[in-house]
Amino acid sequence: MYGSARTISNLEGSPSRSPRLPRSPRLGHRRTSSGGGGGTGKTLSMENIQSLNAAYATSGPMYLSDHEGVASTTYPKGTMTLGRATNRAVYGGRVTAMGSSPNIASAGLSHTDVLSYTDQHGGLSGSSHHHHHQVPSMLRQVRDSTMLDLQAQLKELQRENDLLRKELDIKDSKLGSSMNSIKTFWSPELKKERVLRKEEAARMSVLKEQMRVSHEENQHLQLTIQALQDELRTQRDLNHLLQQESGNRGAEHFTIELTEENFRRLQAEHDRQAKELFLLRKTLEEMELRIETQKQTLNARDESIKKLLEMLQSKGLPSKSLEDDNERTRRMAEAESQVSHLEVILDQKEKENIHLREELHRRSQLQPEPAKTKALQTVIEMKDTKIASLERNIRDLEDEVQMLKANGVLNTEDREEEIKQIEVYKSHSKFMKTKIDQLKQELSKKESELLALQTKLETLSNQNSDCKQHIEVLKESLTAKEQRAAILQTEVDALRLRLEEKESFLNKKTKQLQDLTEEKGTLAGEIRDMKDMLEVKERKINVLQKKIENLQEQLRDKDKQLTNLKDRVKSLQTDSSNTDTALATLEEALSEKERIIERLKEQRERDDRERLEEIESFRKENKDLKEKVNALQAELTEKESSLIDLKEHASSLASAGLKRDSKLKSLEIAIEQKKEECNKLEAQLKKAHNIEDDSRMNPEFADRLKQLDKEASYYRDECGKAQAEVDRLLEILKEVENEKNDKDKKIAELESLTLRHMKDQNKKVANLKYNQQLEKKKNAQLLEEVRRREDSMVDNSQHLQIEELMNALEKTRQELDATKARLASTQQSLAEKEAHLANLRIERRKQLEEILEMKQEALLAAISEKDANIALLELSASKKKKTQEEVMALKREKDRLVHQLKQQTQNRMKLMADNYDEDHHHYHHHHHHHHHRSPGRSQHSNHRPSPDQDDEEGIWA
């Protein structure tokens, strides 16, 4: 029971123990260690009883009810098929694997109730002293007579065996000498002789094996007889002790008078013993027949050996194949007959087991004595061992039959001889086995009462020890589960710390990115303003240079006119006498010219004032427009930074959602494990409650069961807490998802607003350009008018204007040099900022890749846990709907996780491709940075994360 070590403790004063019986050479080696028994005297070890039953396949006692008659000794054949050992588990389903004794199979007979005087109402232990002394004396006489007959038969068998062995050795020596002569004299035919030698050696090895087996059987029988004698001695002592104790018990507790029921029992016992004597005589006759058949087989072997020797001497090979076929068919028939006989025996043994278990159940209900149930349990174990040995023997014989069939032994011509030999072998094996079974049945009958009284005690003690072991195993499993939960909690805490560190690091980096983008935007705006100012200054310088060139040309023309006038004056002075009137006219013309010059100067001053006023108004308008552009750019940068902040916040929310999802999944897995553990603990508690019903008298069981109840309630509370934590995290996750959706909406609105602002700004810039072009046209027209007016100006005014223009040119050149220096310094700082920004982008990519790797690892861990749960449920081999549904649900979750893992890998590949494209675009943009630069748009394109990246940050497996 329960796989624990057992002993059968005797009553007080047991003087001897049964010796350990030798095992058959083909037996398995199961050894059960004998633990401490329950009595105060010496113990009869269970190991001896099991070895006795397993070695010799003893048929145990059969139990009938009170009103059953004596069953017949003829039985139907079993329906066992070849190639398969049927383990029929009846009334408890217990089949112990024991060894099988060679060529010994016991035929179990379902005859009378052997424990007829130890039956329902206390057996013979409470009857009068007359029955105690009369029945054992009859049993002893029958036992002694059968033992003497068996010893005589064994001695005869040993003598015959020795004679046969001597004859075999002589024939072996003759065969060896003939083979040596063949080697020396017939060398040309050595090949044929070698073949013959091999075949003869194989046959001889088979014959030797058969002889060895028969010799071992004889030795085995002798040893069994010795062991049975020792067991008989111990049985006598035990019977004597039982009689004394039952007499004392009858005097103290109760006295049962001789009734009709007891008389019937004694009469049935007498009839049974008469039948046993008849069966023993029958077995003796069968043994004699078997000895005769063995002699016949040995004679046939001698004849075959003689024929072989004659064949070797005459160098011929006649009828060799026929003899081989005959011998093989004989062996085949023997094996098949033995298999069929063992099948019949196995069916009978199973019937006996069923009957014994029913009897044990009935007795345990009627007589709650622990020793009797223990004895019945040991008898059942003996029967199981015998069944196992018979099944092993059947397997061996079936293997032999299959080997012979594979070698092609069975021929259709020799079918009749095979049938005859099979029948002969069946009769011999039946006779021998029935005889051995009868002897063993006697022993088991005599021991059954003691065994029945002792096995119940031992089963209860074994149940107690097994319950203790079971409780210890439950405690160990609980401690292991607690340790595992603690380890998982520490891992979860470590992952939380790591994720918090990553979040803080990401927040720092995002802040640095925001600061750098703001600085970059301001620097880009300043650079753009500087460039615009430089362009304006260059245009002014070009206009002034053109004015200077025009004025120089006008000066040259005026110089030429002056020289012409001087020449004319000189010519006029020479002609002064003739031209006084002309001088007067010239003076008048000069005065008119002076008046015209003064008028032109006044008009020029007025035009200059108007032009300066227009220039100042244009400058004011330019300043206003620049301030508006700067304000719009500042708004743009603020909105872009807020966009980036919102996206970073969305990514942080997504990462937080990922963490919560992972925590949720880990908690769900832990909850499932806890539920499974709770179910297991509840099942174990049910088992423990069942055990408690059987053993309420033991206070230790109650304490341990209370502890188990407390632990189960503690685990239920933990499961409830974990479920509440999961619900709370689910609510938090829903809130985070709602916040994320709100942020996404805000981001979309801000993006639409930024697009509108960009469009408005582009329109304003286009209007500004158009206004500047109009101003340029107006300035060009004014310059042309000034040129026209300056043509008529005096040389002094032209020189002054040239000097003023030269001074203005030098000032503009100095301003241009200063702006160039400022531009170089700002470009250098911008390059440094861009390098820092590139480093920050690389770090952000690395962090995103690490996050994706963590997601993939979490998914892989979840998939492996699902696989482990599926494997556990499939290994449990319970075909319940609930377990199948759980397996299907786990498989669906696993498929979903695999799909999410694929999505994560695709997102990671997209991220890598986007990073590569972004790096390439950034390099190209940096290469053409000095030629074409739009800071607002470039900033937007560089710092806005890709939609794939956003999706990837929002995905959680």
UniProtKB/Swiss-Prot annotation:
Tissue specificity note: Expressed throughout the central nervous system, including hippocampus, cortex, cerebellum and olfactory bulb.
Biased composition (Basic residues): 922-943
GO biological process: regulation of calcium-dependent activation of synaptic vesicle fusion; regulation of presynaptic cytosolic calcium ion concentration; synaptic vesicle priming
Single GO cellular component term: glutamatergic synapse
Gene transcribed to yield this protein: Erc2
Cited InterPro entries: ELKS/CAST (IPR019323)
Purpose: Thought to be involved in the organization of the cytomatrix at the nerve terminals active zone (CAZ) which regulates neurotransmitter release. Seems to act together with BSN. May recruit liprin-alpha proteins to the CAZ.
Protein name: ERC protein 2
Signal peptide per UniProt: none
This protein's UniProt keywords: Cell projection, Coiled coil, Cytoplasm, Cytoskeleton, Phosphoprotein, Synapse
Sequence ranges of Low complexity compositional bias: 14-25
GO molecular function: structural constituent of presynaptic active zone
Annotated region (Disordered), positions in chain: 1-44, 922-957
